[in-house]
């Protein structure tokens, strides 16, 4: 059984032939991906990763060091790489997923059969926006409001925001300090998901994810902004489910 603090598995599946590990954006949680479970192929088991500092782990200290997070999360994931698997990450989750796969390769662990990079500039691009993680509270909240991913009722709830701020600042610390070096391409197929109106992720920078993979590459662009994974969730689910179904047919038919 999976280590429950780290993994939310809405539909455990002992007969699964493929696992999908899902990683959320900065400030997000496993809840983003739970609706996916009802619409994926029957032979796919969805594993939504829940990091410390949010959801049921709200009382735990969040990570501010991406390298340490990768090492600790990788250790939790290792026993569950016994099936072919894919990784889906949105925004910060894409970069976290990429660093996990780099770590797996270094450790000579099984690599994913597919990687979904969603709503993120390619990992060799460093964040060029003015850092926000150390802003005074009011200014920090205003920046969050400008991003559009946090409900207004949450931003206006002072008590709730007091609980969330350590996690939010920690996530943005990792986001704003991350830049991956160019390394040999990963032997893995890639799907790039993006928002046509995502002002923070130019499509050219999004498509440059393909520089980091040497497998087949496909692109799906949605008519949304940065948080298209929330605003266009049904379409994202359909795109992911279709790709996973093709993987099961093409790559796992003889398993």
What are these regions (language model features)?
Residues 1-88, 95-255:
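Domain-scale detector for complete catalytic domains at protein termini or as standalone homologs
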């Amino acid at each position: 059984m999976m280590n429950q603090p780290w993994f939310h598995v809405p539909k455990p599946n002992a007969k699964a032939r493929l696992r999908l590990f899902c990683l959320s954006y900065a400030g997000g949680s496993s809840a983003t991906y739970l609706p996916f479970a009802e619409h994926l192929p029957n032979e796919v088991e969805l594993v939504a990763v829940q990091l410390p500092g949010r959801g049921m782990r709200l009382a735990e200290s969040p990570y501010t060091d991406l390298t340490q997070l990768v090492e600790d999360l990788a250790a939790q994931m290792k026993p569950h790489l016994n099936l072919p698997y894919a990784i889906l990450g949105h925004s910060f989750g894409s970069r976290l997923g990429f660093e996990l796969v780099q770590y797996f390769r270094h450790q000579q662990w099984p690599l994913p059969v597919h990687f979904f990079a969603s709503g993120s500039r390619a990992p060799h691009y460093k964040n060029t926006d003015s850092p926000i993680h150390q802003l005074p509270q009011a200014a920090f909240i205003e920046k969050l409001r400008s991003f559009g991913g946090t409900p207004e009722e949450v931003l206006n709830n002072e008590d709730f925001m007091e609980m969330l701020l350590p996690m939010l600042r920690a996530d943005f610390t990792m986001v704003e300090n991350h830049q991956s070096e160019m390394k040999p391409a990963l032997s893995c197929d890639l799907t790039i998901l993006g928002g046509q109106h995502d002002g923070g992720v130019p499509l050219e920078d999004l498509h440059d994810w393909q520089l980091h993979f040497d497998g087949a590459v496909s692109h799906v662009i949605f008519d949304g902004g940065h948080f298209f994974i929330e605003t266009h969730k049904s379409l994202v689910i359909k795109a992911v489910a279709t790709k996973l179904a093709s993987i099961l047919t093409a790559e796992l038919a003889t398993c």
